Curated annotation (Swiss-Prot):
UniProtKB keywords: ANK repeat, Chaperone, Endoplasmic reticulum, Membrane, Phosphoprotein, Repeat
Biased composition (Basic and acidic residues): 1-20
GO molecular function ontology, one term from the record: signaling receptor binding
Record GO biological process: cellular response to prostaglandin D stimulus; protein retention in ER lumen; protein targeting to membrane; regulation of anoikis
Protein name, per record: Ankyrin repeat domain-containing protein 13C
Length: 541
């Protein structure tokens, strides 16, 4: 088939209507930069603020296929904090019989029965301890809540700790886009927030270990190559674009080893940090030794660890309790792709070279970013302080200039006792569940996301293979956004140039400049002899 015929077949390509929402709400414990919330950096050596380079459960928009059932979705592929896991280790056969059965009478629908949810709602710990052995504790009710959601929102600590002891999923979101951790932050019990945060990170580590064999097998089957791509960040916030960075990344892949060279260290506080950084993944090493970051300017290296100290966890809890709770959903229900046009008098489909590859350009239509921000747990002082810091950052300031010291937050006074009955809750119309917990203070906004994507049939790497590579380098937050975005059903070809949302106010244009199959000296995947280990070079790894 000729190139012209191929291009004609791609016009007005539309994805299947069955896709639904491909983007789940971003981690609500994150604070989206300039999107109305703020994530403070931890304090490192000498009392200076340090930056979250790899913590993906901050500033995150999560993109994945909508679940086909009410059960929580499967775990996304993320090497650090933001991977979710399945509800528990029970067998599929056991869970198959636990779906609720709706009872219909008089031509109307009666509420489905959720026994685990009911005993959590009523605080029946004894019955819960019995049901927990035979039921799916990660199941969602008709409002999208899991039993853990209800336990946290109602302040039923015993039920919550029992569910966590049986590995109830912490990352799963309800119909409003909130996870149990978000609801715990709203409720304000410090002990519960800490327990959920620790369980979230434990489940993330377990998810990484579970995916490792499949990932190594995929890398081994993929040829050795060199890939170069360019990042250019933009924002519609006045004065912000001038301080946003760009970056040229080089990826080397050999066997089950990957090296990524980058000049962009971080920009989560809106102050671009430049450097000469190399990220090395050694698939032959033990999991605890697999990930290494080299600072090529200072000639030091640090291994990425997953365990956090007690102090680090406590500081993170302080940050969560003093920041807005944020959730963002990129709705793709109405998404479509139409061919971009060029020319003034005689319009024709736009086809241009991107790097070395001929590509067809498409307009991405129907992409809507829906964001929610909650602050019922914050004092007026918290809100004013956060606003002042955000205003400074939007003008090019830096967190370190704020002399920020995290304040040890105490538990909040619990909200008034719940007066809603189980029957009232479960029989409420879907999407209109009576609110449980602290009275909401929530602001919602919607923004249409306009994007362009260039697809090439000439690019030698397939999207599935790219996803395996991006899964390895996902500790870099912006690479994780790219991995999530390309999981959408795209027009034919490989996305050699595309616009992706990174934060609610920031987009990135990613361009694949060069690709070639190649062989490399194995030494580039090892730590140079003259480099010294510095475990505190990147305090947030």
């Amino acid at each position: 088939m000729t190139g012209e015929k191929i291009r004609s077949l791609r016009r007005d390509h539309k994805p299947s209507k069955e896709e639904g929402d491909l983007l789940e709400p971003g981690d609500e414990e994150a604070a989206a930069a300039l999107g109305g919330t703020f994530t403070r950096s931890r304090i490192g050596k000498g009392g200076k603020a340090c930056h979250k380079i790899f913590s993906n459960h901050h500033h995150r928009l999560q993109l994945k296929a909508a679940p086909a059932s009410s059960n929580p979705p499967g775990a996304p592929a993320l090497p650090l904090h933001n991977s979710s896991v399945t509800a528990n280790s029970q067998s599929p056969a056991l869970l198959a019989g636990t779906n609720p059965v709706a009872v219909v009478a008089d031509g109307g629908s009666c509420p489905a029965h959720y026994p685990v949810h009911e005993c959590v709602f009523k605080g029946d710990v004894r019955r819960l301890s019995s049901l927990i052995r035979t039921h799916n504790i990660g199941q969602k009710d008709n409002h999208g809540n899991t039993p853990l959601h209800l336990a946290v929102m109602l302040g039923n600590k015993e039920c919550a700790h029992l569910l966590l002891a049986h590995n109830a999923p912490v990352k799963v979101k309800n119909a409003q886009g909130w996870s149990p951790l978000a609801e715990a932050i709203s409720y304000g019990d410090r002990q519960m927030i800490t327990a959920l945060l620790r369980k979230l990170k434990q489940q993330s580590r377990e998810s990484v270990e579970e995916k490792r064999p499949r990932l190594l097998k995929a890398l081994k089957e993929l040829g050795d190559f060199y890939l170069e791509l360019h990042w250019d960040f933009q924002s519609w916030v006045p004065l912000l674009s001038r301080i946003l960075p760009s970056d040229a990344c080089k990826i080397y892949k050999q066997g089950i080893n990957i090296r990524l060279d980058t000049t962009l260290i971080d920009f989560t506080d809106m102050k671009c940090q430049r450097g000469d950084l190399s990220f090395i993944f050694n698939g032959d090493a033990a999991p605890s030794e697999s990930f290494v970051v080299l600072d090529n300017e200072q000639k030091v290296y640090q291994r990425i660890h997953h365990e956090e100290s007690e102090m680090e966890t406590e500081e993170e809890v302080d940050i969560l309790m003093s920041s807005d709770i944020y959730s963002a959903t990129l709705s793709t229900k109405s998404i479509s792709f139409t061919r971009a046009q060029t020319g003034w008098l005689f319009r024709e489909d736009k086809t241009e070279r991107v790097g070395n590859f001929l590509a067809d350009f498409y307009l991405v239509n129907g992409l809507v970013l829906e964001s929610r921000k909650r602050r019922e747990h914050l004092s007026e002082e918290d809100i004013l302080r956060n606003k002042a810091i955000m205003e400074s950052l939007s003008k090019g300031g830096n967190i370190m200039e704020q002399n920020f010291e995290p304040i040890r937050r105490q538990s909040l006074t619990p909200p008034p006792q719940n007066t809603i009955t189980w029957e009232e809750y479960i029989s409420a119309e879907n999407g209109k569940a009576p609110h449980l917990g602290r009275e909401l203070v929530c602001k919602e906004s919607k923004k249409t996301f306009k994007a362009t994507i260039a697809m090439s049939q000439e690019f030698p790497l397939g999207i599935e293979l790219l996803l395996n590579v991006l899964e390895v380098v996902a500790p870099f937050k912006h690479f994780n956004k790219l991995r999530e975005f390309v999981q959408m059903k795209l027009p034919p070809g490989f996305p050699v140039k595309l616009d992706i949302p990174v934060f609610p106010t920031i987009t990135a244009t990613v361009t694949f400049q060069e690709f070639r199959y190649d062989e490399f000296d194995g030494s580039i995947f090892t730590i140079p002899d003259d480099y010294k280990e510095d475990p505190s070079r990147f305090p947030d790894l």
